[in-house]
């Protein structure tokens, strides 16, 4: 416990809050180009083949981002838009790819939560 005199000489420093999606640099979304599209397996209690892509952003960073929804049309050199948001059971995946924007198609035959997956309203 510091004395009052010590606090006058050197005041307390506020704690710095670090961003969980620092590569976006305070932007809501960032554009990038896919350098590799592949599947990976989740952490221990879960089992699946999760679709992920390595994306080189316009600011030069290279990040791993998750491709949500069933099936996708992404391949190398596809231009995508990413947002923040981690995938809990995939270590190192801190971003999501937005569906229905730029080169990414929306999820086909999606009826509910369509706006999250870039799907048009069914007729």
Curated annotation (Swiss-Prot):
Residues 1-27 are annotated as: Disordered. GO terms for cellular component: small ribosomal subunit. SUPFAM superfamilies: Nucleic acid-binding proteins. The modification 3-methylthioaspartic acid is found at residue 89. Residues 9-21 have a biased composition (Basic residues). It holds the Pfam family Ribosom_S12_S23. GO terms for biological process: translation. It comes from Roseobacter denitrificans (strain ATCC 33942 / OCh 114) (Erythrobacter sp. (strain OCh 114)). This is Small ribosomal subunit protein uS12. Part of the 30S ribosomal subunit. Contacts proteins S8 and S17. May interact with IF1 in the 30S initiation complex. GO terms for molecular function: rRNA binding; structural constituent of ribosome; tRNA binding. Keywords: Methylation, Ribonucleoprotein, Ribosomal protein, RNA-binding, rRNA-binding, tRNA-binding. With S4 and S5 plays an important role in translational accuracy. Interacts with and stabilizes bases of the 16S rRNA that are involved in tRNA selection in the A site and with the mRNA backbone. Located at the interface of the 30S and 50S subunits, it traverses the body of the 30S subunit contacting proteins on the other side and probably holding the rRNA structure together. The combined cluster of proteins S8, S12 and S17 appears to hold together the shoulder and platform of the 30S subunit. Belongs to the universal ribosomal protein uS12 family. Signal peptide: none annotated.
């Amino acid at each position: 416990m510091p004395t009052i005199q010590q606090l006058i000489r050197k005041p307390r420093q506020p704690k710095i809050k670090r961003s969980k999606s620092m590569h976006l640099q305070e932007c809501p979304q960032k554009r990038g180009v896919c350098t590799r599209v592949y599947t990976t397996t989740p952490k221990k209690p879960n089992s699946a083949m999760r679709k992920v892509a390595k994306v080189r952003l316009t600011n030069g960073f290279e990040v791993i981002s998750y491709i949500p929804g069933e099936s996708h049309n992404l391949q190398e050199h596809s231009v995508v838009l990413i947002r923040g948001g981690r995938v809990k059971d995939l270590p190192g995946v801190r971003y999501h790819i937005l569906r229905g924007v730029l080169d990414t198609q929306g999820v086909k035959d999606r009826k509910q939560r369509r706006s999250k997956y870039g799907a048009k309203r069914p007729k």
